[in-house]
Curated annotation (Swiss-Prot):
PROSITE patterns: PH_DOMAIN, SH3. Keywords: Adaptive immunity, Cell membrane, Cytoplasm, Immunity, Membrane, Nucleus, Phosphoprotein, SH3 domain. GO terms for biological process: adaptive immune response. Phosphorylated on tyrosines. Belongs to the SKAP family. InterPro entries: PH-like_dom_sf, PH_domain, SH3-like_dom_sf, SH3_domain, SKAP1_SH3, SKAP_fam. Positively regulates T-cell receptor signaling. Required for optimal conjugation between T-cells and antigen-presenting cells. Residues 230-248 have a biased composition (Acidic residues). Residues 62-94, 227-273 are annotated as: Disordered. The gene is skap1. This is Src kinase-associated phosphoprotein 1.
């Protein structure tokens, strides 16, 4: 029995000596070395982990007599040792450790938080770690950014590359209440898919979580459809409606139809004012834009008319400028997933930002 106790004491003593050597090497030896940026970050993480162990286990791992905390620019580090909550100390190390190896899925390249384009929603959320250790908290504060294809998460809104990212088209999203047991359990949502790792987040409030989920669902719906949606009921109504019916809605004046087409401005043909039925006219060639003529179905396509919400100037040659209130015909939604549609205004054709438009007619 005495031999066992002796071995146990030797093991503990050896562990403490080894711990002290490791801490001395990281804090003192590496201090004078010319380390790369990644190595400096790793050293900071290790120093912070040593400090967390000292704070949480002062009897077994007391602070060295000559301990001093280094000044640094790492926002995750504490400026004093006066923190008493263990969860706070754990979160310091956790913030540095989580996603230590950046998680990139598919062909998503590294990108700075400020350089993401087509941002639809962004803000701070708490992300649940894939696995958490002795040093780690289960949740970490992350700057999250949603665009029309990818969900990114960063350590902060100033980070030069993401800690992780994934294509949202591979997932579904839902609000959940079983991820936490505290007062924020109703502020959680998750991305999930069969056979894939889930991604789980906590927002600042239930309302904020719902806003995230609603926005993500809108993007998922856009990704699943690249054509202009038309309900069956709307289609039936379009077959029965006449110009007089539409004009009764009180919307903007309707463009006169071309021969063989509907909903296009021009002077090559007009409907008989006394004829209340929709009739077909044999299609004939008519000049259009410089790109050539475009065919339309022989029925009204008022669902494809949108009105400008704000003035929009063209930054590129392929963009279509328009003013607030302009009536724009949407030719296609081929680039819907990028936030752009193809529109026509006064014979000019170009891409327009869909967020600057809203339906012109209530059908």
């Amino acid at each position: 029995m005495e031999a066992v106790d002796l071995l146990a004491n030797v093991s503990v003593t050896g562990l403490l000596l080894f711990w002290g050597d490791c801490e001395f090497f990281v804090s003192e030896i590496l201090y004078d070395e010319n380390l790369s940026e990644n190595a400096q970050e790793t050293r900071k993480v290790l120093l912070n982990n040593f400090r967390v162990v000292h704070v949480r286990n002062p009897q077994e791992f007391p602070f060295p007599s000559d301990y001093k905390e280094e000044d640094g620019s790492d926002d995750n580090r504490s400026s004093s040792l006066g923190r008493s909550a263990q969860s706070d100390d754990a979160s310091l190390a956790s913030d540095n450790q989580d996603d230590g190896i950046p998680e990139y899925f598919g062909d998503i390249p590294p990108v700075a938080a400020q350089d993401i384009v087509n941002v639809l929603k962004q803000g701070y959320l708490e992300k649940k770690r894939k696995d958490h250790s002795f040093f780690g908290s289960e949740w970490q504060k992350r700057w999250c950014v949603l665009n029309n294809l990818v969900f990114y998460y960063f350590g902060s809104d100033k980070d030069k590359q993401q800690k992780g990212s994934f294509y949202i088209s591979d997932y579904s999203v839902q609000l959940v209440t079983n991820l936490r047991k505290d007062s924020r359990k109703t502020s959680c949502f998750e991305f999930f898919a069969p056979g894939r790792r889930p991604f789980q987040f906590t927002a600042g409030s239930p309302q904020e979580a719902k806003e995230w989920v609603d926005q993500i669902k809108i993007v998922l719906r856009d990704l699943s459809s690249t054509v202009i949606p038309v309900d069956d009921e709307e289609e039936e109504e379009e077959e029965e409606e006449t110009y007089d019916d539409i004009e009764g809605e009180g919307g903007p004046p309707l463009p006169q139809p071309l021969s063989g087409t509907w909903g296009r401005g021009g002077d090559t043909g007009a409907a008989d004012e006394e004829d209340e039925d929709i009739y077909e006219v044999l299609p004939e060639e008519s000049p259009d834009s410089a790109d050539g003529s475009m065919e339309r179905n022989n029925k009204p396509e008022y669902a494809n008319y949108y009105q400008g919400l704000w003035d929009c100037s063209a930054d590129e040659p392929d963009e279509l400028p328009f003013q607030r209130g302009d009536l724009i015909y949407i030719i296609s939604k081929e680039y819907n997933i990028y936030g752009w549609w193809v529109g026509e205004l006064n014979g000019a054709v170009g891409i327009v930002p869909k967020d600057f438009l809203h339906p012109a007619y209530i059908l």
